[in-house]
């Protein structure tokens, strides 16, 4: 993966899709760490699903945390794993910021190896990077706290039979083989990249500011069902105190792998 932007920036958007942007924010302490809210709802949704499955000493849950940055969400989940005698090492944090990975690995180096989370650098839009997660797959849960929102600021990607290579996701390769030249939105591309890393029943739990983050994406819908979409009132610090300001809501999505 390149260290900086590899495509044209969409006018009017922040550099959310540029790893160098995040490296600077994390290294200089400019990022607050928790986007939208601290993520307790995501943790509870993940635990509720996992507790309805069968796990034991030989098979702890496997969780893929997308774009954690410096969030404490993974740490909260790991603590819940330890309380349930699940191995925290089943949690894999993946981010395209080298600084986020460095900070995460530094913290985990102090943990017991069986409970130390993995931190891996990868661009979620690049299958050459995502395929490196295969040794940890299949994942039972995907955690996504506004990462899809950030990815959505990227431009759509064109694919054609002549552009397909061994670095192309096999799911995407099959689509191009059938349909020919296509253009894939960034969130749809992420959804397709997650397919080979998951199995039927895998849950993708995503917190977003958008009321329609996963809507009208037919290629996503082929592999993922939107099971629920729950409104969550935004924390007070993110809304104006002016009396007539409307309430602001975030959205907790649950998608199930078909």
Identify the role of each PLM range.
Residues 62-127:
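Class I SAM-dependent methyltransferase SAM/SAH-binding core
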Residues 215-258:
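Class I S-adenosyl-L-methionine
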Residues 200-221:
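Conserved Class I SAM-dependent methyltransferase catalytic core
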Residues 34-60, 76, 80:
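Conserved alpha-helix/loop element of class I SAM-dependent methyltransferases that forms part
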Residues 1-41, 45:
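N-terminal, positively charged/glycine-rich alpha-helical extensions of SAM-dependent methyltransferases
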Residues 144-148, 153:
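A short beta-strand submotif of the Rossmann-like class I SAM-dependent methyltransferase core
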Residues 160-200:
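A short glycine-rich, Lys/Arg-flanked "PGG" loop and its adjoining helix->strand segment in the class I
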Residues 129-142:
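A short acidic, Gly/Pro-enriched loop at the edge of an enzyme's catalytic core
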């Amino acid at each position: 993966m390149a260290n900086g932007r590899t495509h044209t920036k969409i006018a009017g958007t922040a550099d959310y899709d540029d790893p160098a942007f995040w490296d600077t924010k994390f290294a200089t302490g400019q990022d607050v760490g928790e986007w939208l809210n601290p993520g307790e709802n995501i943790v509870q949704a993940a635990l509720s699903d996992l507790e309805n499955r069968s796990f034991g000493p030989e098979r702890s849950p496997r969780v893929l945390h997308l774009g954690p940055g410096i969030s404490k969400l993974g740490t909260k989940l790991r603590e819940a794993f330890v309380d349930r005698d699940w191995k925290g090492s089943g949690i894999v944090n993946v981010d395209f910021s080298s600084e986020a990975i460095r900070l995460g690995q530094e913290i985990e180096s102090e943990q017991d190896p069986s409970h130390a989370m993995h931190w891996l650098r990868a661009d979620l839009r690049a299958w050459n990077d995502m395929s490196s997660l295969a040794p940890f797959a299949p994942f039972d849960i995907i955690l996504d706290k506004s990462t899809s929102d950030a990815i959505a600021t990227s431009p759509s990607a064109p694919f054609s039979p002549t552009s397909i290579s061994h670095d192309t996701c096999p799911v995407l390769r099959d689509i191009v083989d059938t349909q020919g030249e296509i253009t894939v939105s960034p969130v749809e591309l992420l959804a397709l990249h997650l397919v080979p890393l998951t199995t039927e029943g895998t849950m993708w739990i995503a917190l977003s500011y958008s009321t329609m983050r996963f809507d009208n994406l037919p290629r996503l819908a082929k592999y993922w069902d939107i099971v629920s979409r729950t409104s969550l009132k935004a924390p007070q610090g993110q809304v104006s105190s002016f009396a007539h300001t409307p309430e602001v809501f975030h959205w907790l999505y649950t998608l199930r792998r078909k």
